[in-house]
From Swiss-Prot:
Subcellular localization(s) per the UniProt record: Cytoplasm
Sorted UniProt keywords: Aminopeptidase, Cytoplasm, Hydrolase, Manganese, Metal-binding, Protease
Annotated family: Belongs to the peptidase M17 family.
PROSITE patterns: CYTOSOL_AP (PS00631)
Protein name in UniProt: Probable cytosol aminopeptidase
Primary enzyme class: hydrolase
Protein's job: Presumably involved in the processing and regular turnover of intracellular proteins. Catalyzes the removal of unsubstituted N-terminal amino acids from various peptides.
Entry GO CC: cytoplasm
Cofactor note: Binds 2 manganese ions per subunit.
Length: 495
């Protein structure tokens, strides 16, 4: 399954389209005097004063004015959030382009690199159709108009070009995550995960290793194997390795992803309402393989491994039952008291394997692991639990620069108390209280000593209904790709 190309031709300079709108970004406290005169009625009546989110269109001159509010309050998320709608407009306009004019005050307040980068990401996400299985999608595809940027401050041109190049690459992989995450489980199976991973590896010169069921049994990966016992779709573990041509550090990062292509809950079956959303339970794995693709295409100088465990959790006569005990890859015995807490079983084996075989300096996992994290943080941030202040701080820095929000949660030893089993080394659930935290403590049992590790629970950020900042709504978001790209850059700069 190939990764789609970018949908928009984006450049810096005059728009090459025959027909296009100029999009003029305006700050409320830097409102041009000529426009105050030209649109005296609109400004006097409050129809358009440059408030954040206000839009006024001059159809005669084909100019759209977009207000961004006051300069002192401007943030990149407040700029980027407006461009999803313009991506959607481009999708509907037949070949009509957009020439975006960036005022000097904006590129002085926020770097031209960052502004162009995040606008490109928002436009590409907005234009990307997710109704790919609909008859309408197949029959009514329209030509997308060109987009260009005009900078008032010519001195910021190189910065803008850097952001444009980066945005074109990263947005493609974000949409790659969104595309496969939105496909239903009968269209995207564990085998399709292998196909997608092979294409990303082929495009970027990555080494790929696929563990099918016989290899998983040989390696005694009881966690992954136990989850798929009720499904006719066989489990996989997929490893992608990126070795930079010009490494700038010997530090190695491992990215682990949870890939449940569908999670019914198994014997501990989920409620019927919204169960269709459990096709999104593979977003952690989707992010892992697309992030390493973006990292490789950008040519970042840090060695990276992406490893994902892929399975389908279904009820069946052969399915694992509450109370069953399995032996994990690292030899720990696990009592499964709830088959709907299956993601941690998959992750445990992958964490152990990667830790033993690759000995990374930094290792993190991304997983739609617990509903409890949504109760804690809503859909605005992913929860981070880590055994390393160094890695946590690197993630915080990457979160700020990428505008993909995280929030640190505790990993105190007390949260592991209720994971004790009376028959095995550990059980897979610890009750409702602190559910995200006890889940992280479970995973910690599978991390090799000496590895700086972080667990990122993306259950609240992997998909959402409403757009917020740099995160698109109405389905999967592709959360984590920008965060991981920025994290790798931070690791490369760390001395």
């Amino acid at each position: 399954m190939k990764l789609d190309k970018n949908k928009i031709q984006i450049s810096i300079g005059k728009n090459p389209s025959k027909t296009f709108y100029k999009l003029q970004l305006l700050l409320k406290d830097h409102f041009p005097e000529n426009l105050k005169t030209k649109f005296s009625f609109q400004t006097a009546s409050g129809i358009f004063t440059g408030e954040n989110g206000q839009i006024f269109t001059d159809e005669v001159e084909k100019i759209i004015y977009l207000g961004l509010g006051e300069t002192s309050k401007i943030k990149i998320r407040g700029v980027a959030q407006h461009f999803f709608q313009f991506g959607e407009k481009l999708k509907k306009w037949e070949g009509v382009g957009l020439e975006i004019h960036l005022p000097k005050v904006l590129t002085n307040s926020l770097s031209a690199d960052l502004v162009v980068y995040q606008i490109v990401n928002s436009l590409e996400q907005g234009v990307y159709a997710i109704n790919v299985l609909a008859k309408e999608y197949k029959e009514n595809s329209k030509k997308i108009g060109n987009v260009s940027f005009i900078l008032q401050d010519a001195a910021k041109l190189k910065e803008a070009e850097k952001g444009l190049k980066r945005g074109k690459i990263v947005s493609r992989y974000i949409n790659g995550v969104r595309h496969i995450a939105h496909l239903p489980a009968n269209h995207f199976t564990p085998e399709e995960f292998v196909s997608r991973s092979k294409e990303i590896a082929k495009d970027n010169g990555l080494k790929i290793t696929v563990f099918d069921e016989p290899q998983l049994k040989k390696e005694k990966m009881g966690g992954i194997l136990s989850v798929c016992e009720g499904s006719d779709k066989k489990a996989k573990m997929i490893l992608l390795e990126y070795t930079p041509v010009k490494p700038i550090t010997k530090k190695k990062l491992a990215i682990i992803g949870k890939g449940l292509t569908f999670d019914s809950g198994g014997i501990s079956i989920k409620p019927a309402q919204d169960m269709h959303e459990m096709k999104y339970d593979m977003c952690g794995a989707a992010t892992a393989i697309h992030a390493i693709g973006a990292i490789a295409e950008l040519g970042l100088g840090v060695p990276v491994i992406a490893a994902i465990g892929v399975a389908e959790n279904m009820p069946d006569a052969a399915a694992i039952k509450p109370g069953d005990v399995y032996t994990a890859y690292n030899g720990i015995t696990v009592e499964v008291q709830n088959t709907d807490a299956e993601g941690r079983l998959v992750l445990g084996d992958v964490l152990s394997y990667v830790g033993k075989k690759f000995k990374p300096d930094y290792m993190l996992d991304l997983a739609t692991l617990t509903g409890a994290i949504i109760i804690s943080l809503g859909h605005e941030a992913a929860g981070v639990m880590s055994n390393s202040d160094v890695l946590t701080n690197l993630l915080k820095e990457a979160s700020i620069s990428s505008d993909e929000r995280i929030w640190e949660m505790p990993l105190w030893e007390e949260y592991s108390e209720d994971l004790k089993s009376d028959i095995a080394d550990i059980r897979n659930v610890a009750g409702r209280a602190g559910g995200s935290l006890s889940a992280a403590k479970f995973l910690e049992r599978f991390v090799e000593p000496g590895i700086a590790w972080a667990h990122i629970d993306i259950a609240g950020t992997a998909w959402r209904k409403k757009t917020s900042g740099t995160q698109i709504g109405n389905g999967p978001t592709g959360y984590g790709v920008r965060l991981l790209v920025d994290l790798v850059e931070k690791i490369g700069k760390k001395k």
